[in-house]
Design a protein with these regions (language model features):
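Bacterial N-terminal signal peptides
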Residues: 4-15
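Kelch-like beta-propeller repeat domains
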Residues: 16-306
């Protein structure tokens, strides 16, 4: 007697899920299968950097026009759980882990034009599984796991023009495996987990204003998760994938800082955590990541257009 009711509910939920906005398209897979990578865009190309498996030093460049990949100069050290950001045509790789060593304070600059790496001023607080965002030409590194195996609330800014670091107001909620996005001169630290614990993921969303050097709480992400990727498009922060407990997620949600509201979008075709995301034109490319919780790997490259 209950079967028709359950079937009706299932069909309604399936239909609602199918009607979520946004379109996904498969693109050329990355040559290597990895997870816990970072992605950055320079000159209309996407650079996938570091990660688990044999990809710790790998850098691969994706050309969305040709839908093809090519190798670039490897990083000086094998790193995963790094932060990466592009400023003035160069990519800065900040912190991360070296397997068997732990969190590091290193900063490396990559110049795509010369295909060369340069060591820069070390970060004050060694950490991995951090997140970075850019405001006013400076790269803010927030949170992560430091050398004692616990979260740090550190919020430190790197100025590539001067090669110096400055300390700023600590995060309200220290975390790792989160994302940071910058919109209209403010940073948003979204989701993550506590002290690296898969079962302690959070949905907290906190805004940092560099002008006032203050944090404040904003609307939390509807889907609690960690190991996410984020990208900025049309003034919104799009959050992709992640994991929580014993499963990975295909969720896509965007945050509008103006309205302080979240919106759901069409789910990822391939659920993943530890993935990278970068914007080209009006689309976001979501690449690599683990399809199962823990150390699993993929070469998936999927293009999302809102």
């Amino acid at each position: 007697m209950q079967y028709p009711i359950l079937l009706t509910i299932f069909l309604l939920l399936t239909n609602a899920y199918a009607q979520l906005p946004g379109k996904w398209q498969p693109r050329a897979p990355m040559p290597s299968a990895r997870t816990e990578v970072a992605a950055a865009e320079v000159g209309g190309k996407i650079f996938l950097i570091g990660g688990y498996d044999k990809g710790g030093q790998l850098v691969e460049e994706y050309d969305p026009v040709k839908d093809s990949w090519r190798p670039r100069a490897p990083m000086p050290k094998p790193l995963h759980h790094i932060g990466a950001a592009a400023v003035n045509g160069k990519i800065y790789v900040i912190g991360g882990y070296i397997s068997g060593v732990g969190p590091v304070d290193t900063v490396y600059e990559f110049d795509p034009g010369t295909d060369q790496w340069t060591s820069k001023k070390a970060m004050p607080t060694p950490r991995g599984a951090l997140a970075v965002g850019i405001v006013g030409g400076k790269i803010y590194a927030a949170g992560g796991v430091t050398t004692n195996g616990r979260n740090t609330p550190a919020n430190e800014a790197y100025d590539p023009a001067k090669d110096i670091w400055t300390r700023h107001a600590s995060m309200i909620t220290p975390r790792d495996h989160h994302a940071v996005g910058a919109v209209d001169g403010k940073l948003y630290a979204i989701a993550g987990r506590i002290n690296g614990n898969h079962d302690r993921s959070i949905g907290d969303n906190e805004e940092y204003d560099p002008a006032s050097n203050r944090w404040r709480a904003r609307a939390p992400v509807p889907s609690v998760r960690s190991g996410i990727a984020a990208a900025i498009l049309s003034g919104k922060i799009f959050v992709f994938g992640g994991e929580y407990g014993r499963r990975t997620h295909d969720h896509v949600e965007s945050y509008d800082p103006t309205s302080d509201k979240w919106q759901r979008w069409s789910p990822m075709p391939t659920a993943r955590h530890g993935l990278g995301a970068a914007v080209i034109g009006n689309s976001i490319y979501v690449i690599s990541g683990g399809p199962k919780p823990g150390a699993t790997f993929s070469s998936v490259n999927e293009m999302f257009t809102p």
